[in-house]
Amino acid sequence: MPSLGRLHLITDTRPGRDPLTVVRAALAAARADLVVQVRVQDSATDREAYDLAARVLALCAPYGATCLVNDRLHVALAVDAAGGHVGADDLPVAAARHVLGPTGVLGVTAREPRGAVEAVVAGATYLGVGPCHATSTKAGLPDPIGAVGVRDVVDAVDVPVIAIGGVTADRVPALRAAGAYGVAVVGAVSSAADPGRATTDLLRALA
C-alpha cells in the first residue's frame, strides 16, 4: 500500500471549474505529499469519470503522488488507481474491500465512533471524518461535528483520520490537535486565486 499523504485534494468538477489546472498546481507544490481524490458529479458518465481519473493519474505519476477515485470503484480499477473512497450511499465497506482487493487503499466516510469502528473492521484503510465545518462545496450534508467530533472518532480507531468539510489552513491546527492525521479539501485549493500557494499554506499548517 502506498504511503498516505496528509493533504487530500478532491477534484472540483462543478460547472466552470478546471480541475486539471488545480491538480497540476497542487502537485507542483506538494509532490508526493498530496493525495488526489477524483470525484465527479453524480450526473457524470462513467466515461467522463474514467477520462478524468486517467488524466489525473498521469499527472500524479511523475511526483509519486497517490491517486484515488471516489465512489466509482470500477473506474479506480480501470485506470489502476491506488484505491478508492466510499461514502454512506456507495457500496458497503466490506463489498468495497472485496472489489479493491486486500492491498488497495480504501477510504470510508465516517461521522461518529460506532460507524467508524464498523468501517475499520470491514476493511477501511483510512477514514474521512466530517463535515468538520460548514461547507458550500457539497449539498445535503449533516451538521458539522467540529474538532470535538473528530477527536471522538480518533479515540475509537487505529487508522488515519482525514478531517473534511470547510477545512482551511487556519482551521488545520485545531484539527491536528484533535488527532487528525490529515485533511481533505476542495474549495480551499480549487477556489483559491493561487492554488499552488494555497496548497503550500495547507502543508505548512499540517507540518
Where are these regions (language model features)?
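Conserved N-terminal beta1-alpha1 strand-loop-helix module at the mouth
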Residues: 1-85, 90, 98-125, 142, ...
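Short beta-strands and strand-loop turn motifs
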Residues: 35-39, 128-136, 183-186
